Each structure stands twice: as C-alpha cells, then as structure tokens.
Amino acid sequence: EAAIPEEFGEPYREALTKLQKDAPPLSAEKVHRVLDGQLGTKWRERFASFDDTPVAAASIGQVHKGVWSDGREVAVKIQYPGADEALRADLKTMRRMTSVLKQLAPGADVQAVVDELIERTEMELDYRLEANNQRAFAKAYEGHPHFFIPRIVGSAPKVVVSEWIDGKLMSAIIRDGTPDERDLCGTRLFELTFDAPARVGMMHGDAHPGNFMMLPDGRMAVIDFGAVAPLPDGLPPEVGRMIRLALDKNYDQLLPTMERIGFIQKGEDISVEEVDAMLRQYVEPIEVPVFHYSRRWLRKQAANNMERSAEQIKMARQMNLPASLAIPLRVIASTVAISAQLDCHVPVRAMTEELIPGFADPV
C-alpha cells in the first residue's frame, strides 16, 4: 500500500481498514459456543464480566473485552469456527503451486521456503502456541524502557486471553500522527525487529499497523504473536556482514558471502551492477545517520524494480532465498513498508551497527 501513489493510497488504505473493522462478527450464541468448547461450560465463572460485542477483528478471529475474575481488564481473542479448515485448504493450494514457482526460479529451493511458510501458518492456528510466544516476549521485555508486552491470562487451542492495553494504534498514527509520534513509532518498530532475535530467539512475524500501539510513556505495546520466526541463535552474522560489504561496495567479498549464505546459487555468474541494484533499497537507508522513510521513496524503489523486471527474472533463476530467512526477510520488508506509511525519520544506521550481528565486525 505504501508504494501506491497517495491520490490512490488514501482510499485504498481506508478500504482495507474498513474491511478489517467491518468483518462480519460472530453472533453471541456462536461466541458462547466456542468458549464452552475451549474454556469449559463454566467459563463465565472465570470472568467478572464479558462483552458479547467484539471490539476488533483479528486475522482469523475477533477480539472481545472482558474483566477477569481477579479484576484485570482482558482481551479475549476467539478464532472463527471453520477458519482452520479454510486456511488448510489454502495451504494445500499453495503446496500445489510449488511446481509453478519452481519454473520461475528453477535453481532455488522453493519447496523449502513453501514448507517453512506452511509450517508457520499452521502454528498460527493453535492459540496455545501463540500464547507461549507471547509469554516468551513478555518475559524477555519485562521492564524494558521501550516496549510493553501484555501478559497471558489463559489460553486454549482457539481462545487466548491476555491483559488489555489502552494506547494509540499505529494505524491511527499513520492517519493523523504528529511528526514526533511518527518518528518514535518508526524507530520503535525497527528496534523491535532488530532486537528481538537476540533477546528472545524469535522475531515478531506479523508487522501490521493493527498489531502495535504507542503508550503515553513512549513505549510501544506489541500484540498478536501468532506468527513468529524462530531464530534460536539470533540473526546469522553473515546477514549483517553481507549488508556491510554492500555498503562498503566490497564486491570481492560480497559475492562469495552471498553464495555462502545461499542467496546466490553456486556457479552462477552475477554482475556487480545487478547485485548493487538489488541491494540498493536496503543499503541506502544506512548511508546516512537518520533516514527519511516515505511513500515517495518507496514508490521510487518500486518503479526502479519495474524498470528492471526483465533483469530480475534473470536473477531469480540465479538466486535463492534461504528457507530459514524467508520470514525474517519478509518482516524486515514489512517494517520498511510500514515506516514508509508512517513518513518517519529513523536512525537505522546506529541500530544496524548495534543490533545486527556481523555488521560492525572488522572486514
């Protein structure tokens, strides 16, 4: 959406927001039926109160507000009945498309990437796994000056209950935030993306404006941990090294490093110009102390990619996407796109030096 011209972007953005807000809600009867099956028929005893009217739509469910028996305000996320079967049908379709994708990039390990995405999507269907992810993040960031993760109160396969948060959604900041709000929000988002792999051993995998909100004290609250990228050893140092070599235009070491990581297939002859053009949008923001992410800049990157479409098709046959990095790289791309929507200034160079393993290492 950030790459769409602004005259079209605003109605497009409003339509997406309306689509998410106006998703047909479950009736109270169906909500109670899900809670009966997931928390037991005496689930009402766990709540001091429960609002049958949903306050928000989630990716495959809806969120209700309630008060737990101990007086805490809670958010109750309930999975839509049948959402798991529908999503699994989509995954089967994705698996069948693997052969088509292989034709576009015949040397790449497409199957491994698709398997990784399917595995992560399957995990999103079990809210107990989401609850475990959120517990890990909440523990790792407890007392952190920049982030707040709500605690889990209870969970079941299709229901998760967590502490309620009041804050300003990132989507609202995108719409009408002040310059200071935009800059702080974008900075926090990059910090979380870069910091979590080493701190938690995971990366928040659903970089969406509806999953982040800013609190009055400047902390960013993070919700929805259904999609995470497991990185038990953090980001591979080779990734930071690759970015640094590209920044320094040290192509003698860059190309072998990319081949060693798995981005370039062994034996392929890729020119320096091709690699430089491909990595330009990732290197440009760290050439300056503070970078201005904007829709105009992102549209320029998209236009450049369109101009190089024939060249990119050729490169797709020479390059590969390591399966273990499929989701992390998607998250980083989403972080960039959201920052462009925020129209924010981010000290991404300093954060890269501090938080991306391998970037600051001697070459």
Q: PLM features: what roles do these ranges have?
A:
Residues 1-196, 201, 214-221, 225-233, ...:
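Broad phosphate/nucleotide-binding scaffolds in NTP-utilizing and phosphate-metabolizing enzymes
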Residues 201, 206-208:
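Conserved catalytic-loop position in the HRD/HxD motif
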Residues 236:
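Short adenine-binding "F-helix/F-box" segment of the Bergerat
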Residues 239-241:
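Short amphipathic alpha-helical recognition elements used for nucleic-acid or partner binding
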